[in-house]
Regions:
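Zn2+-dependent cytidine deaminase-like catalytic core
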Residues: 36-135, 252, 262, 320
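N-terminal glycine-rich anion-binding loops that anchor highly charged ligand groups
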Residues: 26-40
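Enzymes that bind and transform nitrogen-containing heteroaromatic metabolites
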Residues: 2-13, 18-23, 27-30, 45, ...
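Alpha-helix capping at helix-to-loop junctions
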Residues: 122-126, 145, 149, 198
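Short capping loops/turns at secondary-structure boundaries
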Residues: 109, 113, 129-132, 147-151, ...
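Short alpha-helix boundary/capping motifs
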Residues: 64, 121, 147-149, 327, ...
Length: 380
């Protein structure tokens, strides 16, 4: 493998910045960025906008008017080698006689996974791998998990007081956190493929659970290709079929999957389209709640890559107790609600300190008067 230089890192960072634009629209594909460099100058830039659209390499080649002979291509993910909705990028780079390809991450997709690099090397093109690999893998962490297993990446968001409460005793919760935190939540929603919530949240808050793009900070909004804006699938866990779908706002726009629990094997997995917005499905129970593993595998079959959980204590606790939570976004305000407030969590007791579930603090950031604590599960 060629020596990784500061120059390689500099140009790969530019490719990663481009890739971040695709996090909002590239579903179910990974977010990929590419820059093409000749004589130390960038001559082409591109990122993958949406499934079925040209890949990042092709966008950058177009930007360079396909005049790239002898150039170096920096791309955040291994160039594809198979015919899907678009032709293989590796073959196009070979055809146009680029001199060198620098990649951040290998593609774990079995359809690619090393085959793109082989095409390039067999053509005499120099290949350098794993430049800023850690950053690239984290950027596409949802894709990396979901493409190699049956379960999507799960992000759990909690807004809470300084003393770990999500609401007053009477359920009042608007607003524990400030407007800047809520803007950031819109950004997380916009990067998610579905949002899961529970029946109690729907009844208490009557939320829309939609991405309010007009509330995104300009630095986020300007990245998005407005042509491909989308709304995540909304998944509501209504174990006992208690919700009246004509009463709540969440059922009046976008796509909603309403999940009911059942012990009847004949009902299990059956779906019914209720109207243009709502589909009902029956899923098995585990400990009197919807079986989360069954639910997540079902969503994985829909090619859902990233799940966001925005719910109350019961569902939030269930995701953490189950071990399916890959990351936690804890938005903590300076408010103190007191001992009678509703707890953010009601977790199982650890058997011992050396056997307890543990999350690693990835990042902290201040949003107005609030602080975001971003934790990753121990396996990430």
């Amino acid at each position: 493998m060629s020596q990784v230089s500061d120059t390689d890192k500099k140009f790969m960072m530019q490719a990663l910045k481009l890739a971040s634009c695709g996090l909002y629209t590239s579903y179910p594909n990974p977010a990929v960025g590419c820059v093409i460099v000749r004589d130390g100058k960038i001559i082409g830039r591109g990122y993958h906008h949406k499934a079925g659209c040209p890949h990042a390499e092709i966008m950058a080649l177009q930007d360079a008017s396909f005049d790239v002979e002898g150039a170096t291509v920096y791309v955040t993910l291994e160039p594809c080698s198979h015919y899907g909705r678009t032709p293989p990028c590796a073959l196009k780079l070979k055809e146009l006689k680029v001199k060198r390809v620098v990649a951040a991450a290998d593609d774990p997709n079995p359809k690619v996974n090393g085959k793109g690099f082989k095409i390039l090397r067999d053509a005499g093109i120099e290949v350098t791998q794993h430049v800023l690999e850690k950053e690239a893998l984290f950027q596409n962490r949802a894709f990396m998990k979901s493409i190699t297993g049956p379960i999507p990446y799960v992000s759990v968001k909690v807004g809470m007081s300084l003393d770990g409460k999500t609401a007053l005793k009477d359920g009042s919760s608007k607003w524990i956190t400030g407007s800047e935190s809520r803007q950031k939540v819109q950004d997380i929603r916009a990067k998610s493929d579905c949002i899961i919530t529970g029946v109690n949240t729907v009844i208490a808050d009557d939320p829309l659970m939609s991405v309010r793009y007009d509330e995104l900070k300009e630095k986020y909004y300007k990245k998005i290709d407005k042509e491909y804006l989308r709304q995540p699938l909304k998944v509501i866990l209504d174990t006992n079929s208690s919700l009246n779908i004509t009463k709540y706002r969440i059922f009046k726009e976008g796509k909603v999957l309403l999940v009911h629990g059942t012990t009847d094997s004949e009902l299990l997995g059956t779906e019914k389209v209720v109207n243009e917005h709502v589909t009902r499905i029956f899923m098995p129970l585990r400990h009197d709640l919807i079986d989360l593993e069954y639910l997540l595998k079902y969503l994985g079959e829909l090619k859902i890559r990233r799940v966001m959980v925005e719910a109350g204590s019961i569902l939030t606790t269930a995701f953490i107790n189950s071990g399916f939570c890959d990351e936690l976004y804890l938005f903590m305000s300076g408010k103190v609600l007191g001992k009678d407030g509703r707890n953010a969590f009601n977790l199982d007791n650890a058997l011992s300190l050396d056997k307890c579930q543990e999350f690693t603090l990835y990042k902290t950031k201040k949003y107005g008067s609030d602080v975001l604590l971003h934790y990753l599960s121990g396996g990430n």
